[in-house]
């Protein structure tokens, strides 16, 4: 006969002395916390929200979106006059901000692009100026004839003037324009000598001037020379100075305009000649195809006619 298990015979209902059962009416015990009411709460780690960095410059996409929204609003016919005036002013402000931001980005990109080239040119030009100044002091203190000393000092002063213009060229060249280097690295031969290396008094070792004479200098070099006399180098560097005549004589700008005009004309003539050649070849191929098909049809027709008459 099976044993009769009942609730009264369970070990929970009849606890023994060996096992202690917790009363469920008590608060649960926790090992990591103090259950007393007066105990201070433990400091838990809270997620620290880092505030977003506010960019000092506006977003280009945001400005473009605002411009589109304002233009869409201005296209409405039922827009009141006062609201239209406000939106037109806002549109002008947004467009101005967008233009300034694009110019700032272009400026920073050009600075980053030509930073290293300008640094090398400035370093070489500084060494040239210091070397020539030291040479000038040595010649002035030397025991030479008055005539020979005067000739050497005059030649050194001319070289020193050019070297100072070169240095200012590397420093005050407009930051928003493409930089044209003044110095180039000298290639070394297998025996260690350099090809076409100039005198040590003129250029730094390992570098030489790309443009030997004043006439061969870039157009901006003459602008820098002029700004040195006028005292407007800072304006030139920041691009706030209008430089319509690139050369001191004004030939540079006219020449560049003429070159651009001639280049555009040559491009137009080339494109026209290409189009005409393409048309001629197209017509020729069409004519050839027609002649071939007509010849084939004539041959087929002769054969068929001959066969018909033979019959």
From Swiss-Prot:
Residues 1-54, 239-311 are annotated as: Disordered. Involved in rRNA processing. Residues 7-17 have a biased composition (Polar residues). Pfam families: Efg1. Disulfide bonds: none annotated. InterPro entries: Efg1 (IPR019310), EFG1_rRNA-proc (IPR050786). The gene is efg1. PANTHER family: RRNA-PROCESSING PROTEIN EFG1. This is rRNA-processing protein efg1. Signal peptide: none annotated. Keywords: Coiled coil, Nucleus, rRNA processing. Residues 59-168 form a coiled coil. Residues 19-41, 256-283 have a biased composition (Basic and acidic residues). It comes from the Eukaryota. One of its GO terms (cellular component) is preribosome, small subunit precursor. GO terms for biological process: maturation of SSU-rRNA from tricistronic rRNA transcript (SSU-rRNA, 5.8S rRNA, LSU-rRNA). It is found in: Nucleus, Nucleolus.
């Amino acid at each position: 006969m099976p044993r009769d298990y009942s609730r009264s015979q369970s070990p929970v209902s009849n606890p023994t002395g060996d096992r202690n059962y917790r009363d469920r009416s008590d608060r649960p015990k926790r090992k990591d916390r103090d259950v007393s009411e007066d105990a201070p709460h433990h400091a838990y780690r809270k997620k620290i929200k880092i505030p977003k960095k506010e960019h000092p410059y506006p977003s280009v996409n945001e400005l473009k979106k605002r411009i589109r929204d304002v233009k869409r609003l201005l296209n409405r016919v039922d827009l009141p006059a006062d609201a239209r005036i406000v939106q037109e002013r806002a549109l002008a402000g947004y467009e101005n901000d967008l233009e300034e931001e694009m110019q700032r980005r272009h400026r920073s990109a050009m600075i980053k692009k030509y930073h290293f080239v300008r640094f090398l040119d400035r370093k070489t030009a500084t060494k040239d100026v210091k070397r020539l100044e030291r040479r000038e002091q040595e010649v002035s203190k030397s025991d030479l004839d008055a005539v020979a000393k005067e000739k050497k000092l005059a030649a050194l002063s001319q070289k020193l003037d050019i070297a100072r213009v070169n240095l200012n060229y590397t420093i005050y060249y407009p930051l928003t324009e493409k930089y044209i280097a003044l110095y180039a690295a000298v290639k070394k031969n297998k025996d260690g000598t350099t090809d076409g290396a100039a005198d040590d008094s003129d250029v730094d070792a390992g570098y030489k001037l790309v443009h030997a004479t004043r006439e061969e200098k870039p157009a901006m070099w003459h602008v820098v020379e002029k700004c040195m006399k006028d005292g407007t180098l800072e304006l030139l560097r920041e691009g706030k100075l209008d430089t319509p005549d690139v050369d001191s004589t004004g030939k540079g700008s006219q020449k560049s305009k003429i070159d651009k005009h001639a280049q555009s004309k040559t491009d137009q003539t080339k494109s026209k000649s290409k189009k005409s050649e393409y048309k001629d070849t197209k017509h020729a191929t069409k004519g050839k195809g027609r002649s071939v098909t007509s010849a084939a049809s004539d041959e087929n027709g002769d054969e068929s006619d001959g066969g018909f008459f033979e019959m």
